[in-house]
Amino acid sequence: MISEDLLVEILLRLPVKPLARCLCVCKLWATIIRSRYFINLYQSRSSTRQPYVMFALRDIFTSCRWHFFSSSQPSLVTKATCSANNSSHTPDCVNGLICVEYMSQLWISNPATRKGVLVPQSAPHQKFRKWYMGYDPINYQYKVLFFSKQYLLSPYKLEVFTLEGQGSWKMIEVENIPSPSTRGICIDGVVYYGAQTAHGLRLVRFYVATEKFGDFIEIPVGASNVYDMNFGYSKLVNYQGKLALLAAKSMSMYDLWVLEDAGKQEWSKVSIVLTREMFSYDLVWLGAVGFVAGSDELIVTAHDRFYQIYLVYVDLKMKRSREVWLGGIRCSDRSSLVLTFTDYVESIMLL
């Protein structure tokens, strides 16, 4: 009979789907896999593996369904992992879990296990709602930041849902909560989002572990005067583990502003020009969406004349690219929305 330590080591090497099947082997295996110790250890090892790309497609003019697909590199793509109808808010994907709104309720889903849970309702009748998902890598906790208010000119209130056990809500007692106005991003336990203030648009940081706000981050002058995050001309991205602002000047020209020092609020700028020689001539660009985790590879979405979607990986140093066909997945036209999460890792979180 093998020792428990050796069994744990064997189980840690399994992908999530085979690991989930091991729950049915015997009571001992199920106890080990469901233990907080094993889940934390599995998560810490998963973070060191090569991330996947998770992308979501919404077809605006047909069923308004979000379809989620996961992919490894360089060959993609697996079949859809889950879908959600009539979602009025764009989904979020953090550390292997997806948060999406369906029928005015929040759901958290694990694509690797194909299981999900309904987040207990908080302020269900509030007219204005906004949420972000975050992950605390120190305590291995997933949290949802939920902003709500009844009237347009009213201040937002903020509640935080912690996904642990039965789940719990906590009201954040802060005056003048920064009003969310852009999509957010979670990097190393900090949720960043854009907020309108008396001094214009600023970046807000919320520390997931302590559930406290940090100081505002000023957007670089050269970016704030030209680009508008509210209308999608720029987006927050993870560039080699740092917060960055990817600002579109056109479909082929971008400015990448990288936050080098959050304390000193020092930004660096890189200008990106995508030339036609980098792509097949029969592809129509939809736009850049982010970077492959830990690299200089820019990911650009595109479609061919049959509206089949491609991901194009552009090596900015070598000035070359590789195109990946997504198995015939189609968008209806250029207005179909494609979201890409470039640092997806499988989670053993059993929902």
UniProtKB/Swiss-Prot annotation:
Segments forming domain F-box: 1-41
Classification via SMART domains: FBOX
A family per Pfam: FBA_3
Xref: SUPFAM superfamilies: F-box domain
Disulfide-bond pairs as recorded: none
Protein's name according to its UniProt entry: Putative F-box protein At5g52610
Species of origin: Arabidopsis thaliana
Record lineage: Eukaryota, Viridiplantae, Streptophyta, Embryophyta, Tracheophyta
